Amino acid sequence: MLLRRLPAVHFAKGSRQFGSLQAIADSFVQLHDASGVPWLVLIPTATFALRTVFTLPLSIWQRKRIVKQQELRKVVQSVPPVVKLRLASMTAKANDEELTSSGSAIQTKEETVGALQRGKRQLTPDQITMLSLKEMRKRQKVLFKKYNVQMWKNSVLPLVQVPLWVTMSMGLRKLTDSRLVDTNMPHAHVLQDLSETSWLTHIGSLDLSLPLDAAPMLIPIILGTVSMINVEYNGKTMQATAVGTSGITTATDTQSRTSQTVNSILTATRLSTIFLIGVSTQASVLLSLYWITSQVYSLIQNRILDLLWPYQR
């Protein structure tokens, strides 16, 4: 009896994973049958609804938080110059004292040891810059905590949005494992002439579990165009706001750390978009439609957020 139960326990986790994906596929099938809406309308509508319920509130929350962070960063921008001036003044004063003590005719042993210790406490320009930046980050952290806009909260949106996208993609992939023809659209009779069929009838006869064989590059081109527009728009926004985001370094300097980070993110995003275009050539029509709709929603959402809560320039 014990030996018979072991395989079921061993595969329990895997079966739960496949069961959750099957539940998503079954939910779409039930929604399709109950509503009578065609698949090509149901998937975009469901995508907009899911993004509006789960990611839009988090996106608004994050946008407001980032704008507040930029405002607070402008407040602490005055800290490094003041700290640099104070540290430089202390260093110069220590140097003057060192010159005064070394100019005496006779120095005791205690005076010599004290002079050596003061020399160790003197700061170089690089150390002064590092200490001023450290003080700025310390005060910035205190301000962020005071206004409840801590940096770790910026990771909440990706932790929700990415798993949602992956889960939906896998669920639709499970849905299109077998042949999927839309029963909520008109179909042509077997003996009907092809010239007499309308475009709705032609779409209704498509197998949505396969790529679009009639125009194999149409969907990848649409997906790639929308994705690249989204990437370049976000990249332009990131580069324009890098000055307010960093506080010290500027994105116009190609050698700055901020500029290199922004360029690295944009390069990785462009490469992932190209990879997604290649995958869409072999993906089902339904899955590619979900990806296109998600990209369109992101583009519209970012435009609206930029109008309502623009980043600080």
Curated annotation (Swiss-Prot):
Top-level taxon in the UniProt lineage: Eukaryota
Record keywords: Membrane, Mitochondrion, Mitochondrion inner membrane, Transit peptide, Transmembrane, Transmembrane helix
InterPro entries: YidC/ALB3/OXA1/COX18
Subcellular location: Mitochondrion inner membrane
Mitochondrial matrix compartment spans: 230-272
Ranges in the topological domain labelled Mitochondrial intermembrane: 294-313
GO terms of biological process kind: mitochondrial cytochrome c oxidase assembly; protein insertion into mitochondrial inner membrane from matrix
GO cellular component: mitochondrial inner membrane
Entry's transmembrane regions: 209-229, 273-293
Membrane topology: Multi-pass membrane protein
Molecular functions per Gene Ontology: membrane insertase activity
Annotated PANTHER family: CYTOCHROME C OXIDASE ASSEMBLY PROTEIN COX18, MITOCHONDRIAL, OXA1
Function comment: Required for the insertion of integral membrane proteins into the mitochondrial inner membrane. Essential for the activity and assembly of cytochrome c oxidase.
Family statement drawn from the similarity comment of this UniProt entry: Belongs to the OXA1/ALB3/YidC family.
Protein known as: Cytochrome c oxidase assembly protein COX18, mitochondrial
